[in-house]
Every structure is written in C-alpha cells, then in structure tokens.
Amino acid sequence: MENIHDLWDRVLAEIEQKISKPSFETWLKSTKAHSLRGDTLVIVAPNEFARDWLDSRYSHLIAETIYTITGEELAVKFIIPPNQDDEELEFQSSKKKQRKPYEETNDFPQSMLNPKYTFDTFVIGSGNRFAHAASLAVAEAPAKAYNPLFIYGGVGLGKTHLMHAIGHYVIEHNPSAKVVYLSSEKFTNEFINAIRDNRPDDFRNKYRNVDVLLIDDIQFLAGKEQTQEEFFHTFNTLHEESKQIVISSDRPPKEIPTLEDRLRSRFEWGLITDITPPDLETRIAILRKKAKAEGFDIPNEVMLYIANQIDSNIRELEGALIRVVAYSSLINKEITADLAAEALKDIIPSAKPKVITIQDIQRVVGQHFNIKMEDFKAKKRTKSVAFPRQIAMYLSRELTDCSLPKIGDEFGGRDHTTVIHAHEKISKLLQTDTQLQRHIQEIQEKLKQL
C-alpha cells in the first residue's frame, strides 16, 4: 500500500468532490493520517467534538472511498491529539476483509446503500418532483415502469439520494432481490482489477446477475473505451433479462463527451429526467427535515437566513447547517442569525453576484440585434430572428442553471432538442467565427453591467 499520508491526501481529494464545502472545511480539512495499525487506518481529528462527528457520520463514506482507491477494506479509527495514550481510546471498527473487489459476496448489494437516503427522508420540491415520481414508480415496479431511468442534474441536488431510495424500497418489499449500487469510477476500477488478475468472468457474473443496478456519475465513463464496452454488454444483458437499470449523471446523455453513440442511444431508451436547484420554500423544508433528523433545535429565523444565503444545492445547504451547529457547540453560544452569519462568513461572499436570468439574456440579445422580446418566443425562422434566438439559447445554457426543458419553455415552448442543437451550433461556430466571438463578448459585457 502507498504511504498513508499520500493515501489520506487522495481520500480527502475524493471526498471533497462528494460533500459540501462547509462540511469538508469544518470536519475533514484539518484531519491528518496518523498510522496504519493492522487493518485500521488511524486519523487525527482536531478535537473531541469533531472526532465523534466524523466517527458517527463519515466512517462509511471514508471506508468506501479507501476501498475505491485501494481495493482494500480498512476500518477507520479517529483519535484526538493525544494528551493520553490513544491506544486507550475506544472507537468503532470493523475487520478488513481479504478479498478481490470483484469477488462475489453475500452482503455486497445492501452494504453500499446509505441508510439515511430513503424516500421518507427526501424533500420534494418543484425542482425534483418529476424525478422523485419517476424514481418511486421504478422502485414500485422494477423494469416495468421506465428502464433505464436516467437522472441528471448538478452536484448535491439529490440524484444519489433517489438512487439509494430506490434500492432501499426494492429490498424492503423484496428482501431476496439483488440490488447493487456503485459509482462508474468504482465499476471502472473493479473492471481494471479483474482484467489485471485475469478474472473477467467473476466481474461479469457479479454485475450481470442482479435485479437492480444503480450506477452513479456515469459521465466518468467518458473516454474510457474498454470500460464503455464492458458496461454496454452489462447493460444489454440486464435489459434483455428485464432487470432494472438506474443511471445518474451531471448532464443529459447527449451532452456527455466521448460517450459511444450505442451507449447514448440505450440511455435514451427509457426515461430521462432532471433535477434543478431547490427554491426557497424547498430549501427551508430541507433544513427543517435535516434539523429534525439530527436532533438540532434551530430557530426559524436561522433556517430562513441559511436558506437565503445558500441556494446552490442541498449538500451545501445541509453543510452550512452543520457548520452553524458545530460553531455554536464549540464556542458554547446560543444559535442565532448573528451567530450563523459569523459561522458562515468564510463561505458566503460579502456581496452575492447578480443571478442572470433567461429574460435578462433575451433582453440584452434583443437590444444587441434589434429584435423584440416576443420574437424569441415566436415561430419566425428568418435568419435575422433565428440566429439571435440561437445565441440567446446558447447563453442561457452557459450562464444559467436552468434545465433544457426550462430553457425551451422560455423560448416559446420549444423542445429541449432545439436548445441542444442551438448550443452545439453556436459552440462550433465560436471556434472559427471571429465576428460571432465579438457579438458574444459584447453581450456578456452588457450582462455583467446589469
């Protein structure tokens, strides 16, 4: 195994991409690798509160990340800077299992599901209502509703939560079902290990003999030709045998670069649904549910303050709440809006930049090309209107967090494929068309001045 300090740096780098910035900076950033004692990696936490929090809430994620990187299952033991012999401290641990990562095990399917991610703990809002309904339909009737189900959206919006919820629901209603959840990165690593050890059949048997396959972050297969080939055949085998496949990504299939067309087309066989950032009401509901689940007593004014300040994603939102609670505990002061502002000052910019809307883009593009606002929604196809409309669609995709269907709606109810076509066309022209480059630059400068 590599040097434990290098290993811990890699683990932290992986986890930083998976959890919110507030959570990472509060709990993990200041941790350090201490030693490797047999099957246990010992990590130093900055204080007793952080040690207990890490042990109860991050052990599973850390162990899973270590396994993804090394192919070995290590227990994780948290200690504090020793004023006493840390050998005397008691921590939760589990024994390392000596097995190949692709080897068949009885506990494999359920072990990778997070017990906190269920339909009961999922907060439904306008940005995720359709994705939630589709996920529930799939869980209630695997391979009969939508197969595959493809969920896409930004980081921390609930895609992984829904995938785990599907897995839990299926197992609860059919305990004998084989449900497998994994990331595409783990699929890739296990495939590489299987080829290296000349045991590809074990790998194939593991993933082609399941009832429900939940694979996260499929965009990471982009550019990995051999892994795409393997997943293509795995997909076909499962689909032909009426087994459910659920896939998540940070973008729709058509926008995943260097993804083979045959895989792209299969992802489009079933239902594609997106998740968008939560609105204010949903953010407050998320904070209330999180506070209740963790046993936090948070005043309404504090939850409103956090919800107004953090509007990017659920992971950042919950991380901010945890940071406020931790800060209150560490300085032994009551949680108030002022304390929340103090706790979050490092992660909330002093002046939030203006959010550009599709209407802003349409107005500025219309002024630039001397066309009316209503022309963007009209059926006109003359070049004097169609080309500025495509530029506005391109900028809407680049400068807003709106989904493809939402952008299409704002342009007269056009189909999302029209938005994709406009984005691809303008992107291609920008590589060689200097006049278009100037137009885009001037429009963006005007948008900055709004």
UniProtKB/Swiss-Prot annotation:
InterPro entries: AAA+_ATPase, Chromosome_initiator_DnaA, Chromosome_initiator_DnaA-like, Chromosome_initiator_DnaA_CS, DnaA_C, DnaA_dom, DnaA_N_dom, DnaA_N_sf. Residues 112-328 are annotated as: Domain III, AAA+ region. Residues 1-84 are annotated as: Domain I, interacts with DnaA modulators. ATP binds at G156, G158, K159, T160. GO terms for molecular function: ATP binding; ATP hydrolysis activity; DNA replication origin binding; lipid binding. Residues 84-111 are annotated as: Domain II. Keywords: ATP-binding, Cytoplasm, DNA replication, DNA-binding, Lipid-binding, Nucleotide-binding. Residues 89-108 are annotated as: Disordered. Pfam families: Bac_DnaA (PF00308), Bac_DnaA_C (PF08299), DnaA_N (PF11638). GO terms for biological process: DNA replication initiation; regulation of DNA replication. One of its GO terms (cellular component) is cytoplasm. Residues 329-450 are annotated as: Domain IV, binds dsDNA. It is found in: Cytoplasm. Disulfide bonds: none annotated. Oligomerizes as a right-handed, spiral filament on DNA at oriC. HAMAP family: DnaA_bact (MF_00377). Plays an essential role in the initiation and regulation of chromosomal replication. ATP-DnaA binds to the origin of replication (oriC) to initiate formation of the DNA replication initiation complex once per cell cycle. Binds the DnaA box (a 9 base pair repeat at the origin) and separates the double-stranded (ds)DNA. Forms a right-handed helical filament on oriC DNA; dsDNA binds to the exterior of the filament while single-stranded (ss)DNA is stabiized in the filament's interior. Domain I is involved in oligomerization and binding regulators, domain II is flexibile and of varying length in different bacteria, domain III forms the AAA+ region, while domain IV binds dsDNA. Belongs to the DnaA family. This is Chromosomal replication initiator protein DnaA. It comes from Geobacillus kaustophilus (strain HTA426). The gene is dnaA.
